[in-house]
Design a protein with these regions (language model features):
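Conserved AAA+ ATPase small/helical "lid" subdomain
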Residues: 1-65
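C-terminal engagement/docking regions of AAA+ P-loop ATPases
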Residues: 54-200
Length: 200
């Protein structure tokens, strides 16, 4: 059982995505399946996610709520539990782990049956979304500029605190990336068919 510090909230969509990481890793041909995927992968990842949420709350204030982006803080916890095949070694462990996380979000998103067409259409018009670090209200304000995004997030968060709403909105975006409806650079979300830009 993963240790989650008292007071840290891990929303269902984050918890399910953590569990899905282990499932996706077991299906990924770049992962050495003869070595197996450790049962501890999901436990280690959830502990990193919870610690990341706690650290953010200490730095910026607000409630300690786990967000999808916290899973990327856990990439070392994933790479440390995977043995890679030759192809995976060529691509690099971090890239493989990052893609596994994205596919995990994409796997979990459909279970919520959210209306995401307006969100995808917004990005297909050439718009980008960059979420500011730390400031929950500013990030929600940025999300409000994407038609349908906060509505989808509210359907998940059901009137919870702003931190939970932000976590839900991030999950919708990451789920769409995982389903290849959007792409994600280092700092921003954009339409899937645009080439990814890692230098900005």
């Amino acid at each position: 059982e993963a240790y989650v510090p008292e007071g840290v909230l891990v929303p269902e969509w984050v918890r399910l995505s953590v569990e899905a990481v282990a499932f996706v890793a077991r299906e990924d041909r770049r992962v050495d399946q003869t070595a197996g995927v450790s049962q501890r992968l999901a436990i280690s990842l959830l502990e990193v996610v919870a610690a990341s949420a706690e650290r953010r709350a200490l730095l910026h204030g607000g409630r300690p709520v786990a967000r999808p982006l916290d899973l990327y803080q856990g990439l070392p916890a994933i790479t440390g539990k995977l043995e890679l095949e030759y192809e995976g070694e060529l691509q690099g462990a971090e890239r493989v782990a990052r893609e596994i996380v994205q596919r995990a979000f994409g796997l979990v998103l459909p279970r919520y049956r959210l209306r995401t067409e307006p969100i995808v259409a917004h990005f297909e018009e050439g718009n980008l979304l960059t979420l500011p670090e730390g400031d929950v209200e500013e990030a929600l304000k940025a999300m409000a500029g994407v038609p349908g995004l906060l509505e989808a997030a509210r359907a998940l968060a059901e009137g919870e605190a702003p931190e939970v709403l932000l976590s839900a909105g991030e999950f919708v975006l990451e789920g769409l990336v995982g389903r290849r409806k959007l792409s994600r650079g280092e700092a921003s979300y954009q339409a899937a068919e645009r080439p990814r830009s890692y230098g900005n």
